[in-house]
UniProtKB/Swiss-Prot annotation:
It comes from Picosynechococcus sp. (strain ATCC 27264 / PCC 7002 / PR-6) (Agmenellum quadruplicatum). Keywords: Cytochrome c-type biogenesis, Membrane, Thylakoid, Transmembrane, Transmembrane helix. It comes from the Bacteria. This is Cytochrome c biogenesis protein CcsB. Its main location: membrane.
Length: 462
């Protein structure tokens, strides 16, 4: 490199600045923003259609290599691209970041300059300046003093300098697009924050058991699931319809501190979760966790139950109850639901009989009492610190959209000798603005006018 190459006037010296300006201009292009938004939408739809966070076996069964879905989407491709966790993949987050940068660049390059232009205005001091307005008229009489009350009635903000007048209203319509951009950026920040700081967990907890959130299957790199409190499942139950179908299932949950003091309590059901300390507990499923039985006059004891796979996919749970002290013999108890009935089989697989909760059944010389069926609540536990931020962003977007529909209207007037010039323009609702201006002109004209507003109002489009 020579001395001349390092001088301020060297082309190499200005090269980084040119690259920066070119890149900024490109990223601020509306077409680029739309393309990024479309890509984000497509991958978001894929994340909705394709089950997220399932096991490899699930994807192998539902997305086989032969035949592959759409000819190419096999489980290997799906996992390789990260389509099993779309919203936390590096490329999805890069798209969100790029879209946010595009919005910021567009805001500073287009929207803020447009607002600045709207706030900077000039008086019209020459008649020919009115010719460039979409709507203008020339009257042989009129005054600014008679015009000002009419504009004030229409809620215009008025500025006057001698015989020159400028009025405007609806500048909030210029601020609206900026608010929309800010709202979208806030929404993106909330989404990224939720992806990095949130987690999801699943728990299957029997009634009467205390638990902490441990079974986390999806977590952001900055997430923290450990909390100084735990949750008691006070009770789980199911309401059934008269036909035996499930109507709704409920969990009575209590949040307790390390000393057992209750901090929060709520009975949750499907679509009615418990929210506490940034974590939401959703009621999603259920199971039979165990059975409580009594043999003759023995103490009541609880045995675990396990789900048994069936050919038709029907739900079935079973438990084994020893009937001898050395556990050398026992019976099997099968249950389909929590309606209080069970079927008992001996070791040979022969039916002993059916029994309901609270009833006894003789098994040889043993009297077996079915005390209770213990239900387990299936909870989906989710923490997303970005949710309040996302909601705030949505509110800002909606507010900005409403503001954007406000028309930004401008009116100029000039009293020059015995001539009076009046004109204006608006960025939307052209017909309504024309009627408004005609109404003002009609008020200004006297009965001795030589022409009517209809034939004096002109449009540069004609």
């Amino acid at each position: 490199m020579t001395v001349s190459d390092s001088s301020p006037n060297s082309p190499w010296h200005s090269f980084p600045r040119k690259v920066w300006r070119t890149g900024l201009k490109w990223i601020a292009d509306l077409r680029v923003a739309i393309a990024l938004l479309l890509l984000i939408s497509v991958f978001s739809i894929l994340g909705t259609v394709i089950e997220q966070g399932s096991t490899i076996q699930f994807y192998q069964e539902n997305y086989p290599e032969d035949p592959a879905l759409l000819g190419f989407l096999s489980w290997k491709v799906l996992l390789g691209l990260g389509l099993d966790h779309v919203y936390t993949t590096w490329w999805y987050l890069v798209l969100l970041l790029a879209f946010g940068v595009s919005l910021i660049a567009c805001t500073f390059r287009r929207q803020l300059p447009a607002l600045k232009t709207a706030r900077n205005w000039n008086y019209y001091s020459q008649a020919r300046q009115f010719n460039k307005l979409a709507l203008s008229t020339e009257l042989d009489h009129g005054s600014l003093q008679s015009l000002k009350p009419q504009l004030e009635k229409k809620r215009y903000k008025i500025f006057q300098d001698g015989e020159k007048l400028y009025a405007r209203k609806g500048i909030v319509g210029r601020i609206g697009p900026i608010i929309v951009h800010i709202g979208m950026i806030v929404t993106l920040v909330g989404s990224i924050w939720g992806a990095f700081g949130g987690f999801m967990a699943q728990e299957m907890i029997p009634s009467g058991v205390n638990f902490k959130v441990n079974n986390v299957f999806k977590a952001g790199i900055f997430s923290e699931s450990d909390r100084p409190w735990s949750v008691n499942v006070n009770r789980f139950w199911i309401d059934y319809t008269p036909t035996g179908d499930i109507d709704q299932f409920y969990s009575d949950l209590s949040v307790v501190d390390g000393e057992g003091q209750e901090l929060e309590r709520k009975t949750i059901s499907v679509n009615h979760p418990l929210r506490y300390d940034g974590i939401t507990f959703y009621q999603t499923s259920w199971s039979i966790g165990g059975v409580q039985v009594q043999l003759n006059n023995s103490p009541i004891f609880q045995l675990p139950a396990a789900q048994i796979p069936t050919e038709n996919g029907a739900k079935l749970w079973g438990s084994w109850v020893p009937i001898k002290p050395d556990m050398s013999a026992g019976v099997s108890i099968l249950m389909q639901d929590l309606q209080g009935s069970a079927i008992v089989y001996n070791e040979q697989g022969e039916l002993v009989g059916a029994v309901r909760v609270g009833d006894r059944l003789d098994v040889g010389d043993i009297s077996l009492k079915l005390v209770d069926l213990v239900g387990s609540t299936g909870l989906q536990i989710k923490a997303d610190p970005g949710v309040p931020v996302v909601y705030t962003g949505f509110l800002l977007v909606m507010l900005g959209v409403v503001m954007s529909y406000v028309s930004y209207s401008q009116v100029w007037a000039l009293a020059a000798g015995d001539r009076f010039y009046l004109g204006g323009k608006t960025n939307r609702a052209q017909v309504a603005f024309e009627r408004e201006l005609l109404e003002i002109i009609n008020t200004l004209e006297t009965s001795h006018s030589q022409a009517t507003p209809e034939n004096t109002l002109t449009s540069i489009e004609q």
